[in-house]
Design a protein with these regions (language model features):
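Conserved cytochrome P450 K-helix E-x-x-R motif and the immediately C-terminal K′/meander segment
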Residues: 42-91, 101-112, 167-168
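Conserved cytochrome P450 K-helix/beta-meander segment immediately N-terminal to the heme-binding cysteine loop
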Residues: 102-167, 192
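Generic, well-ordered alpha-helical scaffold segments in large soluble proteins
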Residues: 18-25, 35-39, 65-68, 72, ...
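Central I-helix of cytochrome P450 enzymes
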Residues: 1-35, 189
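Catalytic or ion-translocation cores adjacent to nucleophile or general acid/base/metal-coordination motifs
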Residues: 28-43, 54
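Cytochrome P450 heme-iron axial ligand motif
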Residues: 7, 166, 172-193
């Protein structure tokens, strides 16, 4: 029972927020309906949807909406214990065995990391359904702030098999997008979410 509760700890609120954020934005709702209809057909019933689930789950827009909800609505506490003495993080040194506790909340809202749109119209504090999409021939799209120097180089422009649709990526925000924690203690349920 406890395992099933933990399994739903993120997915249920994120589905709820995804629905709310989609329903209050008529243009986004129309886009989502179009994406679902293009995959499952306009007359698909709830019982028929299972056969279309792999394509729905890999749809770039739906993935971006879910990832954006995790970014903006979810904060994870990460605990670590250094196994070496004088373990350094930034300007701080920690002795071996002391617990380090941090939150993903700030990192997932860091303006120096995240793309806020070409005219800064999509604040890191607000939901933006397309934040995780990279459009063909648009070097300013994608989750990472354009021009930001990072050792994790994301795609400059993404293309799907046909070459005309956006792709979903988290490449340019590796290390800052950590909705499931990380390391050996990363959430084992992340593959089910």
């Amino acid at each position: 029972m406890l395992t099933s509760l933990r399994t739903n700890a993120n997915i249920v609120p994120m589905i709820g927020w995804s629905m709310i954020d989609t329903l209050i934005r008529p243009e986004l709702l129309a886009q989502v309906r179009e994406e679902i209809s293009s995959i499952a057909g306009s007359s698909a019933k709830g019982s028929d949807i299972g056969e279309h689930m792999p394509k729905l789950l890999s749809n770039p827009l739906l993935q971006s909406i879910y990832s954006e909800e995790l970014r903006i609505r979810n904060g994870v506490i990460i605990q670590r214990v250094p196994v070496v003495d004088n373990f350094k993080v930034g300007n701080w040194k920690f002795p071996k065995g002391d617990m380090i506790v941090t939150s993903t909340w700030h990192e997932q809202r860091d303006r120096s990391v995240w793309n806020e749109g070409p005219n800064m119209e999509h604040s890191v504090e607000e939901f933006w359904a397309e934040r995780f999409l990279v459009y063909p021939n648009d070097p300013n799209s994608g989750p990472g702030k354009p021009g930001r120097d990072t050792k994790f180089k994301g795609r400059v422009g993404g293309i799907d098999e046909e070459g005309n649709r956006p792709i979903f990526t988290t490449d340019s925000v590796t290390g800052s997008y950590i909705p499931y924690g990380g390391g050996t203690k990363i959430c084992p349920g992340r593959f089910y979410a």
